[in-house]
């Protein structure tokens, strides 16, 4: 099927440039973002090479299908393992989820970076109320972990903090 430039833009795959419309994800590894049923709703992309002043990751902008505050990466793959184990491990990044699943640890999902929301925890609470948070041990990860505690309390889930030595 052929898509119009407007349809591509509305899907969050292109951006307006000074010379017209351009590929938003050029020079990046694209990772599909899927909803809880496994349908692609957006993309995140990581730089393949370091580029000065360029963000390491970019996401599809907010669209009708993709809402960063509600999205839980990997949930469609992890939900059966979460039900069986009766807990979920919540990590920062998509690549953390991919690595965990490759190693056979399947009850792992991610937020969009450190931006944990009530909506993320409510989505996870449909499968378990035992949330095990394992954010990175850097400043951003520690700050996000501290922000997560009152959010978990408000949602009414049990939150444990896991730390991995650096």
Q: Which residues does each PLM region occupy?
A:
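Phosphate-handling DNA/RNA-contact segment within nucleic-acid enzymes
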Residues: 1-131, 144-145
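Conserved phosphate-handling catalytic cores of large alpha/beta enzymes
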Residues: 116-166
């Amino acid at each position: 099927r052929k898509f119009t430039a407007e349809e591509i833009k509305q899907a969050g795959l292109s951006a307006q440039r000074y010379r017209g419309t351009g590929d938003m994800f050029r020079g990046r590894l694209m990772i599909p973002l899927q909803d809880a049923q496994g349908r692609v709703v957006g993309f995140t992309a990581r730089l393949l090479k370091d580029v000065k002043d360029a963000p390491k990751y970019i996401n599809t902008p907010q669209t009708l299908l993709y809402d960063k505050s509600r999205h839980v990466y990997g949930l469609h793959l992890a939900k059966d393992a979460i039900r069986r184990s009766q807990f979920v491990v919540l990590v920062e990044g998509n690549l953390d989820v991919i690595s965990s699943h490759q190693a056979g640890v399947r009850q792992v999902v991610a937020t969009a970076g450190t931006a944990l929301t009530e909506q993320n925890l409510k989505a996870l609470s449909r499968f378990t109320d035992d949330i095990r948070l394992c954010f990175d041990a850097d400043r951003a990860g520690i700050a996000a972990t501290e922000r997560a505690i009152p959010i978990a309390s408000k949602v009414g889930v049990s939150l444990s903090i896991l730390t991995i030595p650096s």
